[in-house]
Amino acid sequence: MSRTVFCEYLKQEAEGLDFQLYPGELGKRIFDNISKRAWGEWMKKQTMLVNEKKLNMMNADHRKLLEQEMVNFLFEGKDVHIEGYIPQATN
């Protein structure tokens, strides 16, 4: 049986993550308060961000930037700004 959480990103009950995907206190917060769907949305944005800004995960400053963008996206309702990206219109 799947876990249900009140997702802070979606602002509704949704299926929770199966296990903690990120380390530390932030990882616990994500596990307790973010749904699979929201995490999937973040993963898409993260991939675009890493590619656009040419981030290197071996660089501590790049990891810190990515973590801050993740918190902004998942918990503070701020979208990730990716220069030149125009989202597809939904019909």
From Swiss-Prot:
GO biological process: cellular response to oxidative stress
A Pfam family the protein falls into: Iron_traffic
Gene3D superfamilies: Fe(II) trafficking protein YggX
Gene Ontology MF, one: iron ion binding
InterPro entries (UniProt xref): Fe_traffick_prot_YggX, Fe_traffick_prot_YggX_sf
Gene Ontology cellular-component terms listed: cytosol
Domain of life per record: Bacteria
Keywords associated with the record: Iron
Family of this protein: Belongs to the Fe(2+)-trafficking protein family.
HAMAP family, alphabetized: Fe_traffic_YggX (MF_00686)
Function: Could be a mediator in iron transactions between iron acquisition and iron-requiring processes, such as synthesis and/or repair of Fe-S clusters in biosynthetic enzymes.
Protein name as catalogued: Probable Fe(2+)-trafficking protein
Organism in which the protein naturally occurs: Mannheimia succiniciproducens (strain KCTC 0769BP / MBEL55E)
